Amino acid sequence: MIKAKIAAALLAGTMLAGTAAQAADMPGEGVTVRPVVQAYAEEYFQARILFRALEDLGYTVAEPEEVVAQTAHLALRTGDADFFTAHWNSLHNTFFEESGGDEVLERVGTLLSGALQGYLVDKSAYDAGVQNLGDLSDPAKAAMFDADGDGSADLAGCVPGWGCERVIEHQLTEFGLRDTVTHNQGEYNAIIADTIAREANGENVLYYTWTPYWVSGVLVPGENVEFLAVPYTSLPDGGTANTEFEGKNLGFAVDSIQVLATDEFLEANPAAAKLFEVASININDVSIQNKKIADGEDTSADIDRHVDEWIEANRAAYDGWLEAARAAAE
């Protein structure tokens, strides 16, 4: 009888130890997290890397809501989502403040650093003297980029709600370009596909883009296109930022992309908070993956495979994120 009691006690102790170990490995067990994302395949890669890490910590990741960046920020403010993986620190600052700012939200870590935006033209136009956005105040130079015959330069621009449209609209007025430049907005992939086709046909092109994104793997800065400078730094609402990159003023902040989460979620989930703090992905890895999407590997299964491949190639760093997150939950 005594031996039986001892055995039962040992078994109970082993079970408790196992339960404790499981809880330590899976601090998110029983918690469902609600991400919000933009509806663009090119942003799903880095988001799903974080989703996978959250799942490895025991969290259940709900199907993400797909909205534009401005609405994503508001979704956090209203409590309809817990976190957003594509907050540009400078570009989206207005959205951040409009959604409650530091009182309800927190920017966590730096998921991607060195993100760029800017205006570009084809190499032949650049070599012919169009090297600054301000040059387009000259009607003759602006006409070089007239795609529809109205005499105005056609700028392949930014989708409303992304944030970049505010900068472009501000600068067109600031630099006196309203009479010579038309900001074409709509579905970006359609607009840029037309731009790429026209450049391939030897036509002059003027467009906005950003990195990380696959476009710069097709229209390659320094090869077949060049970034334009701007006359001086001027951002909406009197904003200030470093807009210089490699000696050229691009007009947009040299930015970092962070996870944005609600204070309430971070306080309740220290493991997730630490994960967001330490997770970091090389921006070139995202550009490489985005090029795969552009080349046809664009299904959800393809993106999941890209995530698998990235995790295996970066296993030590990825496991380090999980270890730090688990330690934070103890």
Predicted regions and their residues:
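C-terminal functional modules
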Residues: 252, 265-266, 273-274, 278-330
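Pocket-flanking alpha-helical
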Residues: 47, 64-103, 194, 214-220
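Ligand-binding pocket segment of bilobal, Venus flytrap-like solute-binding proteins
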Residues: 81-85, 159-234
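Short helix-initiation/N-cap motifs at beta->coil->alpha
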Residues: 40-41, 59-74, 183-194, 212
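A conserved helix-loop-strand patch within extracytoplasmic ligand-binding domains
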Residues: 104-157
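Immediate post-signal peptide segment of exported/extracytoplasmic ligand-binding proteins
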Residues: 21-34, 143-152, 318-330
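A bilobed periplasmic-binding-protein/Venus flytrap-type ligand-binding module shared by bacterial periplasmic
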Residues: 117-127, 241, 256-268, 291-292
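Short, well-ordered beta-strand elements
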Residues: 28-42, 59-65, 152-156, 276
